[in-house]
Every structure is written in C-alpha cells, then in structure tokens.
Swiss-Prot record:
Pfam families: 2OG-FeII_Oxy (PF03171). It is an enzyme of class 1 (oxidoreductase). This is 2-oxoglutarate-dependent dioxygenase gloM. InterPro entries: IPNS-like_FE2OG_OXY, IPNS-like_sf, Iron_ascorbate_oxido_reductase, Oxoglu/Fe-dep_dioxygenase_dom. 2-oxoglutarate binds at residue 261. One of its GO terms (molecular function) is metal ion binding. Belongs to the iron/ascorbate-dependent oxidoreductase family. The gene is gloM. Keywords: Dioxygenase, Iron, Metal-binding, Oxidoreductase. Its cofactor is Fe(2+). Pathway: Mycotoxin biosynthesis.
Length: 321
C-alpha cells in the first residue's frame, strides 16, 4: 500500500508527488502520513470528532428522526441515517451502520450559515467543528493541487472544487455497532464513492479495499499516525479516466467483532454546479449525479432499475460468509 508523507506533499517534493500520482492511477487509495505540524492539527481533530461522534449518535431516537438526512438540508449532506436502512455487504442482509452528516457549505460559507439545520449538540460545538472543516478542506485542496501537478492535468480538478462556491462536501460521523455472526446487520456494501476523495480515520478494523493489481480484498488497519485516503468517481470523471476510484466495503472486524467502530469520513465533493461527464458520456451537474447515486443506495434489496448497475459498484460478495 502506498504510504505518502504529508510534509512531502505540502512542500511539493517530487518523490511524494510522483507517488501520489502513481497511487491515483494504479490503486485509487493511499495512506497519508501525519508527519508535520499541519498534519498534527488533523490528529487533534480526529480525537475530538471521535468523541463528538459518540455523543451525537447517542442522541434520542426522536431527535434522530427529526433530523433524518433524507429530509434535512440539501443533497443528502445533513442529518442522521438509521442502522439497517440500506443493503449491507452480505447478500440479503441490511447494512450495519448509522451516521450523522454535517455539511461544509453551511458551516464554512458565512452567507449560508443561517441555513444550517442541526441538533443543538452540533450547534453548541460549531466553532470547533468549523475549525475541523477548515483543516480538512486545506488538506483536500493540497491533495487536488498535487494530483494536478503529478498527472499534468489542466485546472479541471481545482476549478470544480472552488472553495468560494457552494459544494456538496460534508463530514460523516459513522458508527458500526458490534456485529457478531448472529447479528442480522452486516457492514457496508461494496461501492466507489460518488465524490472526489474521502479522508478517513477509524477506531477499529473493518474497512476493506480492492487491490487493483491482485484483485483481492485487503484489510485497512487504522493508525493514529496516518489517515486513509480513497479517490472517488468524480476525480475519475474530471481527469478523463486517469484517476482510478477505490472500490471498498466494510465488514465486521475479523479481530474484534464485538467492538463498536467509529469512522470519521471527510467527503470532498465538487461544487454543486460543476459539470462532470459520466462513463456513458452524459454530462451532469454534480448535485444531480450525487443525488442519483445516493438514491441508488436506498433501493430495496435486490432491486436495481435499468441504468443504475454502474452506480453501486458492485454487489461483490467475494469472501463474505
């Protein structure tokens, strides 16, 4: 697995930029070493967000229902998702996670702050959450800049992620409760992320990504010294196929199935009005393509309308028992 220095990318070191470009075109994922002062701010953010995730996901059920992510905010970027409401990583089983989403647009762009619709617990922590978003945004923009340089692209990536314009970027605070073999809930279906890149931290093992060279699933071990970065569909589209999105899934931990797992996921996504061209040649506004893929996740088990097979990638149950 590629392990790339945050400090090296920040300085624009040729070796690290080349490694990032190689990871993007061969695997679609990498580990980002937190080896400088700027990166240490992210480590601090992760610790706060893990604690906040536990608190917000312990909210009463009536609060979770009132802020369901299908009816809160815009483009599925805000609110709670209940456990077991989508298809899981095992055929016929519902998923094994719940989440709370926070939107970047309403938090970082002052002209939209009054539109933020979140539970009181989130609002009482809004200053710290704002700082977290700023640190993640700077990191994501740095990665886009280095990808542009390493792959000798034009300004496609940077123009589609203009920080002064409304975007669909958000933060996911995700909880996987214990899932022993007798549990009916089972992980998260194999898929590629609809957005541009995802910056992940986790408290327990569970994430698997497909090694594109060996075509085998590999476990991703969480580490306090690294963040895991996955590249998504939108970077593939914006780079005209140069960047490879990471196919991944979440299974119950093979070493701690009785543990509760928390994942902090920063989902960098394009601006709402950015144009992307999907694999079939159709041009979309990102906000519309985003909602189409999120709706595909929520389909009933075994149901997939024509034209959606490429959206959930794919029902690969290899190695799932």
């Amino acid at each position: 697995m590629y392990k790339i220095s945050f400090a090296g990318l920040l300085r624009g070191n040729d070796k690290d930029v080349e490694a990032l470009a190689e990871a993007a075109t061969t695997q679609g994922f990498l580990e980002l070493e937190l080896d400088c002062m700027e990166a240490k701010a992210l480590q601090k953010d992760v610790k706060f967000l893990e604690s906040f995730a536990e608190s917000i996901l312990d909210s009463p059920e009536d609060v979770k229902a009132a802020y369901h992510f299908h009816k809160t905010g815009r483009f599925r970027t805000t609110g709670f998702k209940p456990l077991g409401s989508e298809e899981g990583a095992k055929a016929g089983n519902p998923d094994g996670f719940e989440f709370f989403f926070l939107p970047q647009k309403e938090i970082l762009l002052s002209e939209f702050r009054e539109q933020l619709n979140c539970p009181p617990l989130a609002m009482s922590n809004i200053d710290t959450l704002t700082d977290c978003f700023k640190h993640y945004e700077r990191t994501a923009q740095m990665l886009l800049q280095r990808l542009t340089e390493g792959l000798k692209l034009g300004n496609e990536l940077l123009n589609a992620h203009n920080t002064s314009l409304p975007c669909v970027t958000n933060m996911g605070l995700i909880r996987y409760p214990p899932q022993p073999k007798e549990s009916g809930n089972f992980g998260h279906i194999a898929h590629t992320d609809v957005g541009s890149l995802t910056i992940l931290a986790a408290t327990q093992r569970g994430l698997q990504t497909l090694d594109n060279i060996t075509q085998k699933w590999i476990w991703v071990d969480p580490s306090d010294e690294c963040l895991f970065v996955q590249l998504g569909d939108s970077l593939k589209f914006l780079s005209r196929g140069k960047i490879l999105p990471s196919l991944h899934r979440v299974l119950p931990s093979d070493v701690a199935p009785e543990a509760t797992k928390y994942t902090i996921a920063y989902f960098l996504r394009p601006n709402e009005e950015a144009e992307i061209t999907s694999d079939d040649g159709k041009v979309w506004l990102y906000k519309d393509y985003h909602c189409r893929k999120f709706d595909a996740f929520a389909r009933p088990l075994g149901y997939r309308p024509d034209g959606e097979e490429s959206l959930i990638s794919l029902r690969d149950y290899t190695g799932v028992e």
